[in-house]
Amino acid sequence: MPEYEIQVPSYRAAALTAEERTRLLARPIQNTQKIRTIVQPIIEDVKSRGEASLIDYASKFEKVQLKSAVLKAPFDDDLMKISPMIKEDIDIAFNNIFAFHSSQLRPTIAVQTMRGVVCQRMSRPINRVGLYIPGGTAVLPSTALMLGVPAKVAGCPHVVISTPVRKDGTVAPEIVYIANKIGAEAIILAGGAQAIAAMAYGISGVPKVNKIFGPGNQFVTAAKMHVQNDYGALVAIDLPAGPSEVLVIADETCNPESVALDLLSQAEHGLDSQIILLTVSLSPEMFDRIQKAINDHALRLSRSYIIKHAIKKSVIVQVDNVDQAFEWSNLYGPEHLVLHLKNASSYIPKIDNAGSVFVGPWSPVSMGDYASGTNHTLPTYGYASSYSGVSTDSFLKYITTQELTEEGIQRLGPTVIRLAELEGLTAHADAVRVRGVRL
């Protein structure tokens, strides 16, 4: 087989032990203790000094001198100057995301569990939400849409965005335009752990939020986990999102160029990104065409350096059959799963663990990343085995009610008295007895 400048290491599944398979599917290891020691002092500084600390961090990290670290709505039109074409593109994406997330709203449910006993579940929007929009290696208005639109659909009364400024001290106008469109009340000019702390604890003029959303690097993720575990913050987070990742399953019917670019589109996100390709019964010629396409496209792309670094932690595995491919995929639990398979949709029932799935030759990850309507804020680092991606539900909380009639408590009361006494909780039992229930 030819050698290429950029080549993903490849293996045959049949030649691997269970331990070797585990090693190949391992994510890049992060030194969490070291990250925490960096993040915690920043969080404490923001708690104690508020906006002044954000101004100092902007000077330190972005090399920008800010007079204020907050933009308040209504936002000046000059801050939202974007081309008509980009405005139209954002509006199309907004509408698709809005349509899909609106369909997720659920009516109040009411169930009579037995005669005289009615239980309900109703939703309420989270009052104050904070949306973190990264800005390190790329401007990400798409993330502003993915977080802002479901917040609007859910009806969250107070929305705050936090995003780092550009080199000139301004926020990308696309993000300001989206902030205005979703009804955000403020934009905090900060990135990293300091942004998470500002939203979790509040700063002058911007009260603390109840829940924080948004992807980010290892420092952002560590900060989110820290504030979630701080009872003084009383703040929830969406999910522990880490580096971008994709797993592609491809058979002989695939287009090598499409496979290569689906892989590279995630590799270009960051140095810690990871890509995995599982090939099913590929001929040597088709396998080489994919490797060549990866090399050729990677060398010409603007973020070639990042891709080269990410590929060092990536792998191609030649599996024996489709069932084995899905066994590997479910073990890995990818953020993005792409199916370059004949009759791809027929394999959806085999998927147990994945953030979002891209089915067939016409469904690149890019569509979900920007505008198909699904959400691109997804669980990574294996959390797809226990977490879902961001949805409208993420911005809602559910409250249950129960209402009993006199007949209902007489029917159900004896059961509750006996169960309460079994647990030794006599006040529970007496709260039923005092209402006239007797065994």
From Swiss-Prot:
Q: What class of enzyme is it?
A: oxidoreductase
InterPro entries according to UniProt: Ald_DH/histidinol_DH, Histidinol_DH_CS, Histidinol_DH_monofunct, Hstdl_DH
How are cofactors bound according to the entry's free-text note? Answer: Binds 1 zinc ion per subunit.
Q: Give the residues annotated as active site.
A: E335 (proton acceptor), H336 (proton acceptor)
Highest taxon above the source species: Eukaryota
Q: Please list the GO biological process terms of this entry.
A: L-histidine biosynthetic process
- Where is Zn(2+) bound in this sequence? Q266, H269, D369, H428
* Keywords recorded for this protein, A-Z: Amino-acid biosynthesis, Histidine biosynthesis, Metal-binding, NAD, Oxidoreductase, Zinc
The pathway to which it is assigned is: Amino-acid biosynthesis; L-histidine biosynthesis; L-histidine from 5-phospho-alpha-D-ribose 1-diphosphate: step 9/9
| PROSITE patterns the UniProt entry points to | HISOL_DEHYDROGENASE
Q: Name one GO molecular function term.
A: metal ion binding
Q: What is this protein called?
A: Histidinol dehydrogenase
Q: Which organism is it from?
A: Schizosaccharomyces pombe (strain 972 / ATCC 24843) (Fission yeast)
